[in-house]
Amino acid sequence: MPVWQEYLLVSGLIFLLASLRYLVMTSGYYAVVYRLFEERFSKFKINPEKPTAKDMAHEIKWGLANKLNFLFYGLLIYWLYDHGHLALYFEWDAYPWWYGWLIIPVLLFLHDAYFFWSHYLMHKEPFRRLTRHNVHHGVVNVSPFSAFSVHPAEGFVELAFRPVILVLVPLHPLTLGIFLIITFSLNVIGHSGYEFFPRGYTTSVFTKFGSSASFHYLHHKNGSTNFGLFLCFWDRMMGTMNPDYEEFFEARAKHNKFKLPTPD
């Protein structure tokens, strides 16, 4: 097969699979939470109002448009792999057994650090205008479809993290797959509009640095705070945490019968 045909085939597969993953995971979450168990889960809804069809159409449109970035970076990563530039390894015992598992939280921390600082800049000029970050903030009452619903200019910046990590950090395909599943799932949960996390989540020593759906909802409501994605570590460190976050969260989580241990 000629090289150009190979890359054309790969590009088509990347765009198709990225689009299907987005539609299946977001639609699946929406179908279960917003439809199938709508009445049972209504007490966990952050904003009692339902997302409008217009808002969800807006999110899906930009969510699919952003897949052009997955196509571009997917082709770049394929080219890097084809030319031996990726740090992938395929034998699990090439590194200590614990490395393949420990690197996952390390990657999550690094990814969140990159996201926090790039996201913070997107709320400042000229980066806000250049990345068209206003597209993502076109909806306040978010839904699962908000995940990855950004202008391609913003998506280009957000996804730049991936090829850099794949070149610099040795990763096994299993580790990489788990990392991608976790990040996508957390993105959907964070934009879901429902708060299922237990009471005490924002103050427990085990989870206080984690993000939540309430955390990100407040960012959409007030764009000057809560810039983290998976974590709120940098927001706590840099003083950009919404001062009402913990109280807001507990008010939404009061219906959850589970409570995490918290400091006295």
PLM segments and residue spans:
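Juxtamembrane helix-loop-helix connectors linking adjacent transmembrane helices
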Residues: F72-L110
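Internal active-site segments that recognize and position negatively charged phosphoryl groups
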Residues: L108-K124
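Membrane-helix interface/capping segments
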Residues: E39-N47, I77-L88, H123-K124
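Alpha-helical transmembrane segments and their lipid-water interface positions
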Residues: M25, Y29-V33, Y73-G74, F115, ...
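Cytosolic/stromal cytosol-facing helical appendages immediately following the last transmembrane segment
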Residues: M1-T26, Y34-A53, E125-D264
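Interfacial helix-start motif at the membrane-water boundary
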Residues: T52-F70
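Hydrophobic alpha-helical transmembrane segments of multi-pass membrane proteins
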Residues: G12-L16, L64, W101, P105-V106, ...
